[in-house]
């Protein structure tokens, strides 16, 4: 059952494949904003996946984020969610 307070977390290491250059959202080899959004959605899904009925899923419908600092290759990024 979905309840307020359910939490999720997703982590990944910044690599060339999730960089702004690879995602075509910039030219630098730093963590891309589209990658950050995807990681946030992973955390949100992980928070509720065990509570979803078979065949059900989640869909992101609204994001309001600030990506305020560049994260270089090799650093770990963590996204946390709370329902």
PLM features: residue spans?
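Conserved N-terminal beta-strand and adjoining loop/helix that marks the start
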Residues: 33-37
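Catalytic strand-loop segment that frames the active site of acyl-thioester-processing enzymes
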Residues: 1-32
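Hydrophobic beta-strand-centered segment that forms part of the acyl-chain substrate-binding groove
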Residues: 45-78, 83
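Short, conserved, surface-exposed binding loops centered on an aromatic residue
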Residues: 1-3, 38, 55
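Short, residue-level hotspots on alpha-helical faces of the histone-fold
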Residues: 38-42, 46
